[in-house]
Amino acid sequence: MTIAIGKAEEERGVFDIIDDWLRRDRFVFIGWSGLLLFPCAYLALGGWLTGTTFVTSWYTHGLASSYLEGCNFLTAAVSTPSNAVGHSLLFLWGLEAQGNFTRWCQLGGLWPFVALHGSFALIGFMLRQFEIAQSVRLRPYNAIAFSGPISVFVSVFLIYPLGQSGWFFAPSFGVAAIFRFILFFQGFHNWTLNPFHMMGVAGVLGAALLCAIHGATVENTLFEDGDGANTFRAFNPTQQEETYSMVTANRFWSQIFGVAFSNKRWLHFFMLFVPVTGLWMSALGVVGLALNLRAYDFVSQEIRAAEDPEFETFYTKNILLNEGIRAWMVAQDQPHEKIVFPEEVLPRGNAL
């Protein structure tokens, strides 16, 4: 007679069963974050492809914006709703469209659809990095780094128009449409002179410089561990030792600049810190623009330039250029406002 001693198997709940299935090791990991990521990414991308292929912007902007109307990849866009809609979420079943899909597209309903699902998809992707990092016992710095692009997307596409009078003032989802929005930001907010924009540019370009320097330095200090004829065949992918010399790299940059990173942790943290902080700062600046905050208005130079025709600076020339952008864009974008600029604020003929 055999007697088995042990604990009885506990009853597994529905949550445990779902958790096991979601976090199972498979070719494409799903996880709990995937419940947010995959549906939202699918709907956002599908909405954008549908809009750029078929949907006109005639009713919202008076523009052609789809492949069907003759646009190409650079000029097609999913455009924002008209200014009359305000901040309505434009649900398909809402008061505006009343379940009519064609009318919903004409009103610009695809834009909030793509913007909101796109935002949640990006957040889902960040949570995916958190979830997988936890599973394989990694620190969560990848997810923290990805918060930079998310903060920029949310601030530009959601927070900025929420601070203005409607979704109309957000960027449309298209290449040329984004360029037009950049000109709008410059003309109405003098964005290039904003210190938060400067920090964002420093972060992005500084990160590109660091990336190029780091990649070149590692390539320059690789050990010759194998007999391969080129760099990429000279190493065993399973080797345990380092593939490049930090000491040699440190000596090189110490001679070049007089200072160099002393260890890899500080080096790679700095490469993380520069771009992410730059993106965070630029997102913060856009939140300020949503509230119509100004930065670096050198009024004394403007007054002197107005009084003395021979006095001009690059700043005063840019201010006049911004006024020209506003004078053109208001008539183009907001004809319903019937805004008339007084003569004294229009660009002078010889000023540009």
Swiss-Prot record:
Fe cation binds at residues 214, 268. Pheophytin a binds at residues 129, 142. The keyword Transmembrane helix applies. Chlorophyll a ChlzD2 binds at residue 117. It is an enzyme of class 1 (oxidoreductase). GO terms for molecular function: chlorophyll binding; electron transporter, transferring electrons within the cyclic electron transport pathway of photosynthesis activity; iron ion binding; oxidoreductase activity. One of its GO terms (biological process) is photosynthetic electron transport in photosystem II. PROSITE patterns: REACTION_CENTER (PS00244). It is a multi-pass membrane protein. The keyword Oxidoreductase applies. 2 of the reaction center chlorophylls (ChlD1 and ChlD2) are entirely coordinated by water. PSII is composed of 1 copy each of membrane proteins PsbA, PsbB, PsbC, PsbD, PsbE, PsbF, PsbH, PsbI, PsbJ, PsbK, PsbL, PsbM, PsbT, PsbY, PsbZ, Psb30/Ycf12, at least 3 peripheral proteins of the oxygen-evolving complex and a large number of cofactors. It forms dimeric complexes. This is Photosystem II D2 protein. The gene is psbD.
